């Protein structure tokens, strides 16, 4: 595997955050008029209960660093290898970019709609994501690598997504984020000696924010049944596979991070897939067959393709560009074959909302 370019300066951290690749977090814009037309009257009771939870703000005091935090960073992190240091810094940069992406999107929606239900929801979620991004950015500042988030908002490229794509992608991003964080938290509670940075101690209550955000999009999707039936199921299937594949490939580019926690990247990812499959039954009538041999082989093939694309990019020149194109086509073909693997089908529950019980 090729070495990841090192993050040693704020400029490199900012450059990494600004990247627009298949695997990097993106910034989004959408159709605000369509967002304004969202109607949640069919799930009013569950919606109002959820907004009351946001208003209660049970995490208002959670994202505060303890006085011991910097000392623990100095003591624990001084023991990690340079390679692990780089993978962890890459994780922080990717995470702060992802959290801030949500903050920017939700804030822009709430500024551009009049619908009181949507406006209130987006304001609450932007508040949460702002806290998350700020907390991670402070962890980067401990290494002298803080990112100018205002500058990132102005300079990073934006991708236009229709509202339904926002709903699918963001629902899955929030729920898979919950599954990732809670799996790491539980592992490190069992093995505190492997907690090489204090930020992981915040993950339990943190991931409950992610879970609640996902609940919000679950309610929106269930309030608009046409988004999860008929031809739109093809889009559901696409986003399920795209989100899972992106996570799998990205995680296998930084295996030392999981190894340091006592996890193995493949086992960890399939545990996260399993949790996300169970959760997403609240809103999607289909789920990916993650145990199908062709699914697992396809994921491994995508990792192999990524390493080949990176090698071709490093080679450069005409030959390198031709190799990149060939391997990119191989990746697209692999994704297409995985898309055709039969999915599992199930009935939707009468009650949409669920508790974070993992």
Curated annotation (Swiss-Prot):
Keywords: Bacteriochlorophyll biosynthesis, Chlorophyll biosynthesis, Iron, Metal-binding, NADP, Oxidoreductase, Photosynthesis. InterPro entries: AcsF (IPR008434), Ferritin-like_SF (IPR009078), Rr_diiron-bd_dom (IPR003251). Signal peptide: none annotated. Its EC number is 1.14.13.81. The keyword Membrane does not apply. Transmembrane segments: none annotated. GO terms for biological process: light-independent bacteriochlorophyll biosynthetic process; photosynthesis. It is an enzyme of class 1 (oxidoreductase). Pfam families: Rubrerythrin. It catalyses: Mg-protoporphyrin IX 13-monomethyl ester + 3 NADPH + 3 O2 + 2 H(+) = 3,8-divinyl protochlorophyllide a + 3 NADP(+) + 5 H2O. Its cofactor is Fe cation. It comes from the Bacteria. GO terms for molecular function: iron ion binding; magnesium-protoporphyrin IX monomethyl ester (oxidative) cyclase activity. Pathway: Porphyrin-containing compound metabolism; chlorophyll biosynthesis. Belongs to the AcsF family. Catalyzes the formation of the isocyclic ring in chlorophyll biosynthesis in aerobic conditions. Mediates the cyclase reaction, which results in the formation of divinylprotochlorophyllide (Pchlide) characteristic of all chlorophylls from magnesium-protoporphyrin IX 13-monomethyl ester (MgPMME). This is Aerobic magnesium-protoporphyrin IX monomethyl ester [oxidative] cyclase. It comes from Rubrivivax gelatinosus (strain NBRC 100245 / IL144). The lineage of its organism: Bacteria, Pseudomonadati, Pseudomonadota, Betaproteobacteria, Burkholderiales.
